[in-house]
Amino acid sequence: MSTTIKYEMMILLTEEFNDNELKTWAFNYAKALRKLNASEISVISRGKRDLSYEIANQKRGNFIQISFSSIPKYIENFSSSLKFDSNVLRFLVLNKTNNVKKF
């Protein structure tokens, strides 16, 4: 049996979303995580910001932060669904497990 690991994901979306559309998009992906047996799901909108450089001809983007716990094998499935979403400009998944050894 695999153990769950805490993850944090930052997603950069195109700026075309209004607040309601952004909430709907985030809710749908939170549901997708839930279907993959993720738990402790937290979604935070970090707002619309200017980008340091253009990405896919976009100068601004919406930032979404999603924190969750999941079994590692499901992360690849979820990441591939983000890759095929035309509204996603970039995303990053971080393992939040504390692996630091204390001496």
Swiss-Prot record:
Homology family: Belongs to the bacterial ribosomal protein bS6 family.
The record's Pfam families line, in alphabetical order, gives: Ribosomal_S6
Q: PANTHER family of this UniProt entry? A: MITOCHONDRIAL 28S RIBOSOMAL PROTEIN S6, SMALL RIBOSOMAL SUBUNIT PROTEIN BS6M
InterPro entries attached here? Ribosomal_bS6, Ribosomal_bS6_CS, Ribosomal_bS6_sf, Ribosomal_S6_plastid/chlpt, Transl_elong_EF1B/ribsomal_bS6
Give me the Gene Ontology terms describing cellular component.
Answer: chloroplast; ribonucleoprotein complex; ribosome
Question: Which gene produces this protein?
Answer: rps6
Please tell me the species this chain comes from. Thalassiosira pseudonana (Marine diatom)
What UniProt keywords apply to this chain's record, in alphabetical order? Chloroplast, Plastid, Ribonucleoprotein, Ribosomal protein, RNA-binding, rRNA-binding
Tell me which Gene Ontology terms the entry assigns under biological process: translation
Primary location class: plastid
Q: Which domain of life is it from?
A: Eukaryota
Location in the cell: Plastid, Chloroplast
Gene3D superfamilies found in the cross-reference section: 3.30.70.60
Q: What is the lineage of its organism?
A: Eukaryota, Sar, Stramenopiles, Ochrophyta, Bacillariophyta
The entry lists its GO molecular-function terms as: small ribosomal subunit rRNA binding; structural constituent of ribosome
Its function, per the record, reads: Binds together with bS18 to 16S ribosomal RNA.
The UniProt entry, under SUPFAM superfamilies, shows:
Ribosomal protein S6
Keyword Ribosomal protein assigned: yes
Q: State the protein's name.
A: Small ribosomal subunit protein bS6c
